[in-house]
């Protein structure tokens, strides 16, 4: 039922996008608002020398390919963040988790919808207080996931509104899921074709309002194939369950437990 309601909402939204709105002009969908991305410079915001920032700086130079980019510090970011001439990739922390966030700059009170700021995609990458070190190894994969999503959102409002969860519809036939992190890491490092590894990202301590993420990515192409966000009330919430393994199997994968 939830999926049907979401599909109906998106359909109505896309239909409404073409209609004029009295006193406000045209409604622009997320795809329309993102259309200028390939021609704009993406500012990579870095300040300091944390392991995450060092890894991000190194992997950006290798992996970023979908727009011009420049590095900037927090001072420059403060000056430019209200300009719709730039997109920004930032490292942010929220409720015990670290994220990579790609967002368009602009003034919040801007009347022109095409010049208003908005968040394109938010990728969880690590626990702030209990990092595993895997986030450094997978930084290139996280950047590839952000770029692949952005490319798909440029041509599909369905993807743009669904967010990273849109990956949950992809068939897994002919692929192998490694639930064991060590086995998954080895497959990732050797870029094993058809291998999928699991990544769990959770705050140091569970709580009534905290969340965790469980992610499935391909070892060779870094394609995102499952993205689940859930409440993190106890440690088991961040572990891949037997029920999730069965869901992967129903999508066609072979699961190695």
Role assignments for model-derived ranges:
Residues 1-12:
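Bacterial N-terminal signal peptides that target proteins for export
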Residues 10-11, 21-26:
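Cleavable N-terminal signal peptides
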Residues 24-35, 109, 115-257:
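C-terminal/domain-edge helix-coil "capping" segments
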Residues 24-99:
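Start-of-domain marker
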Residues 97-116:
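Aromatic/basic-lined ligand-recognition segments
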């Amino acid at each position: 039922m939830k999926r049907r309601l979401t599909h109906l909402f998106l359909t109505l939204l896309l239909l409404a996008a073409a209609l004029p709105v009295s006193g406000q002009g045209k409604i622009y969908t997320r795809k329309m608002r993102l259309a200028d991305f390939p021609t704009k410079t993406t500012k990579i915001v870095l300040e300091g020398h944390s392991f995450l920032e060092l890894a991000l700086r190194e992997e950006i130079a290798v992996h970023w390919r979908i727009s011009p980019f420049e590095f900037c510090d927090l001072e420059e970011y403060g000056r430019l963040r209200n300009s719709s001439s730039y997109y920004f990739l930032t490292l942010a922390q929220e409720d015990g988790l670290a994220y990579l966030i790609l967002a368009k700059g602009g003034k919040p009170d801007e009347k022109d919808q095409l010049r208003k700021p908005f968040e394109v995609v938010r990728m969880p990458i690590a626990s702030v207080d209990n990092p595993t070190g895997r986030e450094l190894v997978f930084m290139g994969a996280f950047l590839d996931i952000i770029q692949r999503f952005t490319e798909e959102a440029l041509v599909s409002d369905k993807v743009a509104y669904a967010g990273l969860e849109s990956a949950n519809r992809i068939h897994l036939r002919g692929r192998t899921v490694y639930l064991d992190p060590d086995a998954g890491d080895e497959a990732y490092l050797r870029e094993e074709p058809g291998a999928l590894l699991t990544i769990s990202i959770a705050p140091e301590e569970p709580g009534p309002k905290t969340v965790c993420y469980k992610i499935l990515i391909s070892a060779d192409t870094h394609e995102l194939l499952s993205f689940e966000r859930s409440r993190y009330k106890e440690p088991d919430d961040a572990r891949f369950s037997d029920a999730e393994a069965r869901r992967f199997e129903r999508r066609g994968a072979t699961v190695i437990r």
